[in-house]
From Swiss-Prot:
Protein's UniProt keywords contain Transferase: no
Low complexity composition bias: residue spans: 189-198
Region spans: Disordered: 163-214
Major place of residence: nucleus
DNA-binding region positions on the chain: 212-271
Gene Ontology MF terms in the entry: DNA-binding transcription factor activity, RNA polymerase II-specific; RNA polymerase II cis-regulatory region sequence-specific DNA binding
Disulfide bond sites: none
GO annotations of cellular component type: nucleus
UniProt KW keywords: Developmental protein, DNA-binding, Homeobox, Nucleus, Transcription, Transcription regulation
Taxonomic source organism: Danio rerio (Zebrafish)
Name of the molecule in the record: Homeobox protein Hox-A11a
SMART domains linked to this entry: HOX (SM00389)
Domain of life according to the entry: Eukaryota
SUPFAM superfamilies: Homeodomain-like
Length: 284
């Protein structure tokens, strides 16, 4: 790599980045002609015509057209009294003369919050004497008397009426429940309908409305078919056959015995009904 001194013959008139000082101007003996001229004397060539009219400054034109002194300009936080009318004129225009109490306290009116100088005397006279309420003037005493006095009397009358009603309710005894004659109760207790089972059925029927009794069917269709077949051959069944049926149908000995008893009673009833039917109709 070549050194910087080898590449540059004259190093005294150059600025070296590695140096901590600048080369003084006396070392530069000669300067070009274009650097020695000042900006004011140096001619400048323009590509457009040089006979254009001179343009005035924008701020001077603005202040001159609007007749405002450019030296003072706009005051940023100065007093703005010249922009608004006087306070007295505003109060005079906003507030009319107050003549009555209703005008003194207008509802939802922004002018009620302004205090006019012409109305200070009437306001001071109105607020000067404080009434019995301690807050409102004496002019409101009549309204205070009618409002609070009337409400107190109404409340007292209401309490008196309630006390009278309460005392009358306590004085009148509650009517005793009517006692039913003993003659009706005894036959009901002695009758068979008043048993525990019948009473439960009555209460359940009364609570749930019309209720149909569920048909009891402890035997399946297959069991009933086999029992009916055995009953068709023999109305009475012996012990050996009963045990055989109970094992085959997965029933107890007592269940088979009870079924044959009920079936014989049913057959007897059917025979009786059949006999009665044919006796009433001899032609059949």
């Amino acid at each position: 790599m070549m050194d910087f001194d080898e590449r540059v013959s004259v190093g005294s008139n150059m600025y070296l980045p590695s140096c901590t000082y600048y080369v003084p101007g006396a070392d530069f003996s000669t300067l070009p002609s274009f650097l020695s001229q000042s900006p004011s004397t140096r001619p400048v060539t323009y590509s457009y015509a040089s006979n254009l009219p001179q343009v005035q400054h924008v701020r001077e034109v603005t202040f001159r057209d609007y007749a405002i002194d450019p030296s003072t300009k706009w005051p940023h936080r100065g007093p703005l009294a010249h922009c608004y009318p006087s306070e007295d004129s505003v109060h005079k225009e906003c507030l009319p003369a107050v003549t009555t109490v209703g005008e003194m306290f207008p509802k939802n009116n922004a002018s009620a919050y302004y205090h006019s100088t012409s109305n200070t005397t009437s306001a001071s006279n109105f607020y000067g004497n404080v009434g019995r309420n301690g807050v409102l003037p004496q002019a409101f005493d009549q309204f205070f008397d009618t409002a609070y006095g009337g409400s107190d009397s109404v409340v007292d009358n209401d309490y008196a009426a309630r006390d009278k009603m309460h005392s009358s309710k306590q004085s009148t005894p509650a009517p005793a429940p009517e006692q039913q004659p003993e003659g009706k109760e005894r036959p009901e207790t002695s009758s068979p309908e008043s048993s525990s089972g019948n009473n439960e059925e009555k209460t359940s029927g009364a609570n749930s409305g019309p209720r149909f009794r569920k048909k009891r069917c402890p035997y399946t269709k297959f069991q009933i078919r086999e029992l009916e077949r055995e009953f068709f051959f023999s109305v009475y069944i012996n012990k050996e056959k009963r045990l055989q049926l109970s094992r085959m149908l997965n029933l107890t000995d007592r269940q088979v015995k009870m079924w044959f008893q009920n079936r014989r009673m049913k057959e007897k009833k059917l025979n009786r009904d059949r006999l009665q039917y044919y006796s009433t109709n001899p032609l059949l």
